[in-house]
Design a protein with these regions (language model features):
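Structural signal for hydrophobic packing residues in well-ordered secondary-structure cores
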Residues: 3-5, 20, 49, 81-88, ...
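Glycine-rich and small/hydrophobic secondary-structure elements
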Residues: 1-5, 62-87, 108-133, 150
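Helix-loop-helix junctions that connect adjacent transmembrane helices in secondary transporters/permeases
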Residues: 100-178
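Molybdopterin (Moco) oxidoreductase catalytic core of the xanthine/aldehyde oxidoreductase family
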Residues: 5-34, 87-125
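Gly/Pro-rich active-site capping loops and adjacent beta-alpha segments
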Residues: 1-73, 144-210
Length: 210
């Protein structure tokens, strides 16, 4: 990271080395998201570079799973931001407040897209207030030889592929007065079959059994 003395992040340089296993599969796209989902969080960066290498190894081929590469890049960048805050003597919350991308900002690190929807500033403030950050940061002496501390990190992650993975549902009333809800979501432990039926029943003001 490169930053001014008051903590404005001006440059980000990120390198990711990814193990894709025996076959390519998702290798290039997964590693790409480690930069694609981390660098754009910091809207004041004027220079940024993302370099990655994907290597074959004698392991099971890698695939998509929970975060899809974003978590690795975010962990690295957020750790570096915390180190920067410590080096400059600035509260990690404050340094993020000064740098985060806001709604309406153009994001050069995100293909120049305009951020049309973003509540990151409000989310950050809510976390700060609800956990009592000012009372707990940096550490609190418990008086028994132990201390308690708080830390902070940010993340962004979308769901699906833009313009490809889209969601829809159809609701039909049957001759017998019952409803049929048709969805394309697969319940992989998320409970969507139950949850979406509950939502429909609430909106229709009918029992779930209907």
């Amino acid at each position: 990271l490169g930053a001014t003395k008051d903590g404005i992040v001006k440059g980000i340089d990120l390198y990711t080395l990814s193990n894709t296993g025996a076959y390519g599969e998702h290798g290039p796209t997964t590693v790409g998201l480690s930069g694609h989902k981390s660098i754009p969080l910091y809207g004041k960066a004027e220079a940024f570079r993302f370099v990655s290498d994907v290597v074959y190894t004698n392991h099971m081929s890698a695939g998509a799973y929970r975060g899809y590469g974003a978590t690795q890049g975010l962990f690295a960048v957020e750790s570096a931001v915390n180190e920067l805050a410590d080096k400059l003597g600035i509260d990690p919350f404050v340094i993020r407040q000064r740098n985060i991308v806001h709604e309406g900002d153009v994001m050069p690190a995100y293909y120049g897209q305009v951020n049309t929807s973003c509540a990151l500033d409000r989310c950050l403030q809510a976390v700060h207030d609800n956990i009592g950050w000012d009372e707990k940061y940096p550490v609190r002496d418990m008086g028994n030889g132990k201390v308690r501390a708080v830390g902070m990190g940010m993340a962004m992650q979308g769901s699906g592929i833009t313009s490809v993975d889209v969601g829809s549902a159809s609701l039909k009333i049957n001759d017998d007065g019952f409803y049929t809800l048709s969805i394309g979501a697969a319940d992989m432990g998320t409970g969507c079959d139950t949850i979406l039926a509950q939502i429909a029943a609430e909106v229709l003001e009918c029992p779930l059994d209907n």
